[in-house]
């Protein structure tokens, strides 16, 4: 059965970019609920012994929305927490920076595309930096959808569900995304 991962930082460590209250609710309540629901859905089923990625792929193919949504949200949040750190942002490791320049034509173009993906995601969802074959791509997805089901490998994800930012930013999703990008991303992990 799946468990809530321990964060690599305290709930107050990302403040003021992401407040302690937001992190308490987001990690301790929302993420925990996805895990609890997932465990209840898969208990005693053929899914119970599968890896999280296999559950996502199988439930997506079989149109098992309850299992898929909760499994995918658990996976998405696991990545989201790892992609952030206190005093993040800053310098990108040269290997990743070179790949970004190669695939996007420059780091600022990538930044703009990533933030735009999150801003233009209608309703709840995610924006992603993923590997598609050997190329970095920015995508967005509605609700719990994950690039894994499209044969991509996500390496950076930003949650744009309102529970991610509303307490701190109200309806200012662009400001949340800019701060996430410039001040929270753990580029060493993304690399």
Identify the meaning behind each predicted range.
Residues 1-191:
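Feature for soluble, non-membrane regions of globular proteins
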